[in-house]
């Protein structure tokens, strides 16, 4: 199988420890509640259990995106080039990379409050990630000049 590498040398990644991944916000549309963000998953590190509260889509740019059920069993593997829309309030899951680092474009749609809830082992909410968190990440990118090469912006 051929390996494709996404050239991310112009991307300034922000580590979000609570989700065990790195992000770079590309654009935010306040009026429509849209957040477009690159998320980078390190190889073979399982993601945190969570549930999406809004509609979203994913496009795998590098590596593969692996999905696990709440019990840890493998649900699905999406290879490079996979585009999949997702519904709000779907099944809780975790996601992460396989043997190669994964870079995925996530487009979250139609929410200006909480967008993702992270769950503990008893399925209780342990952390919320919302529209304001992505806005803060974009503001940090702009303030530090991290967005200038890619032109990230709030609409």
Where are these regions (language model features)?
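Conserved short histidine dyad/triad with adjacent acidic residue
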Residues: 25, 33-51, 87-90
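Short histidine-centered beta-strand/loop micro-motifs
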Residues: 37-39, 47-52, 69-70, 75-76, ...
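Aromatic- and Lys/Arg-enriched surface recognition patch
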Residues: 91-95, 105
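A short, N-terminal "cap"/entry segment at the start of jelly-roll beta-barrel domains
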Residues: 1-33, 119-155
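Glycine- and acidic-residue-biased ligand/ion/polar-headgroup-sensing regions
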Residues: 43, 52-71
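A short hydrophobic beta-strand segment most commonly corresponding to one strand
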Residues: 84-85, 99-116
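Short acidic-glycine-tyrosine-enriched beta hairpin
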Residues: 30-31, 71-91
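Conserved hydrophobic/aromatic beta-strand scaffold that supports enzyme active sites
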Residues: 23-25, 36-38, 57, 83-85, ...
């Amino acid at each position: 199988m051929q390996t494709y590498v996404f050239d991310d040398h112009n991307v300034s990644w922000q580590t979000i420890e609570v989700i065990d991944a790195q992000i770079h916000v590309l654009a935010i549309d306040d009026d429509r509640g849209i957040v477009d963000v690159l998320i980078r998953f390190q190889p073979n590190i399982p993601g945190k259990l969570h549930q999406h509260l809004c509609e979203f889509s994913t496009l795998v740019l590098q590596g593969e995106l692996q999905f696990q059920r709440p019990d840890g069993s493998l649900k699905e593997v999406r290879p490079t080039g996979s585009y999949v829309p997702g519904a709000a309030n779907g099944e809780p899951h975790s996601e992460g990379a396989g043997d190669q680092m994964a870079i995925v474009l996530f487009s979250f749609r139609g929410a200006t409050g909480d967008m993702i809830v992270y769950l503990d082992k008893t399925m209780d909410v342990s952390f919320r990630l919302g529209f304001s968190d992505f806005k803060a990440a974009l503001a940090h990118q702009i303030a530090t000049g991290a967005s200038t090469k890619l032109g990230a912006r709030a609409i």
